[in-house]
From Swiss-Prot:
Lineage, broadest ranks: Bacteria, Bacillati, Bacillota, Bacilli, Bacillales
Pfam families, alphabetized: CvfB_1st, CvfB_2nd, CvfB_WH, S1_2
Protein name (Swiss-Prot/TrEMBL): Conserved virulence factor B
Gene3D superfamilies: Nucleic acid-binding proteins, Winged helix-like DNA-binding domain superfamily/Winged helix DNA-binding domain
Record-stated family: Belongs to the CvfB family.
Length: 299
């Protein structure tokens, strides 16, 4: 005979056998009792005793079986992105569309805690039920993503910026999945820092392989990358809220004191920044443009 947990995390037809106060009593396929709160009925009409209806089955925190007609986005057999509600020492708690949150245990998350998802991130998960009849969220494996991603076999996405979320983090690189279903790999040489699991990032497509998987980069195009002097100026602009009282006619002494570079190096650097529309140069000052600020947001 099947165990109770076989129906947990799945959609089943259950018979209504009674009503106690505001709670319906349902009969499971193995004779188990399942409770249904009236708030979890999606029709205004009352359910009829003796009739069968379709429900999603889940356990409360005590392991009691409950049902809902508000079908979740994720079941035992279905993967989707779930919103992270919060993280604590036990792991990350996600919203899968049920009256209660579901936990991704800490041991399933990255070993480096700074790479854990944060509140508002979305992680690719399914449901799993343990031997104690408790329900958890399970991160998608590479095998699962292989079955569900949308392949791209030409260069139509070349240099396109795509928003995606990491579902797997390795030292060699980051594996991401976009809303459109594109699978993207970013080698560690194509990033300055490792993104969090589930964090929304913008990745530039730089190629594809014969399996339809895309290769991406978090780095700007080569001609947009800043040299050392340009980076010094850019970082100071960010630190001082986007504006500095220097321009190409500032004194060499003042430039040396603040930027630790010659006036010639300073002029070349701000010329490069201006050419690529990262800064504006006005009388007596330089300031970040909207494009310049976007580089800060992309970090």
């Amino acid at each position: 005979m099947a165990l109770d947990k076989d129906i947990v995390g799945s959609i089943e037809f259950l018979e209504v056998i009674g009503l106690e106060g505001s709670t319906y009593l349902l009969k499971g396929p193995n004779g188990e009792q399942v409770k249904l709160n009236q708030s979890e009925i999606n029709d205004e009409d009352e359910l009829e005793t003796g009739e069968e209806y379709s429900f999603f089955i889940y356990p409360n925190r005590s392991g009691e079986l409950f049902a809902t007609q508000n079908m979740p986005d994720i079941t035992k057999d279905k993967y989707d992105f779930a919103k992270v509600l919060k993280t604590d020492r036990d792991g990350a708690r996600v919203d899968v569309g049920l009256p209660r949150e579901v936990l991704i245990p800490w041991e399933d998350l990255p070993k480096v805690k700074s790479l854990w998802p944060q509140t508002g991130d979305y992680v690719l998960v399914t449901l799993r039920i343990d031997r104690e009849n408790q329900m958890f969220a399970r991160l998608a494996s590479e095998t699962i993503v292989e079955k569900m991603f949308t392949p791209v076999y030409d260069d139509e996405k070349q240099n396109e910026l795509i928003k995606a979320r990491p579902y797997r983090l390795l030292r060699i690189g980051s594996f991401l999945l976009s809303k459109e279903g594109y699978k993207i790999f970013v080698h560690e040489s194509e990033r300055k820092e490792e993104p969090r699991l589930g964090e929304e990032v913008e990745v530039r497509i730089i190629g594809h392989n014969d399996r339809g998987e895309l290769n991406g980069s978090f780095l700007p195009l080569a001609h947009e990358r800043l040299d050392d002097d340009g980076q010094v100026i850019f970082d100071l602009l960010v630190e001082y809220e986007g504006e500095l009282p220097f321009w190409d006619k500032s004194s060499p002494e003042a430039i040396k004191e603040v930027f630790n570079m010659s006036k010639g190096s300073f002029k070349r650097a701000i010329g490069h920044l201006y050419k690529h529309k990262i800064i504006n140069i006005e009388t007596g000052k330089i300031s970040l443009t909207k494009k310049g600020w976007s580089r800060v947001e992309d970090k």
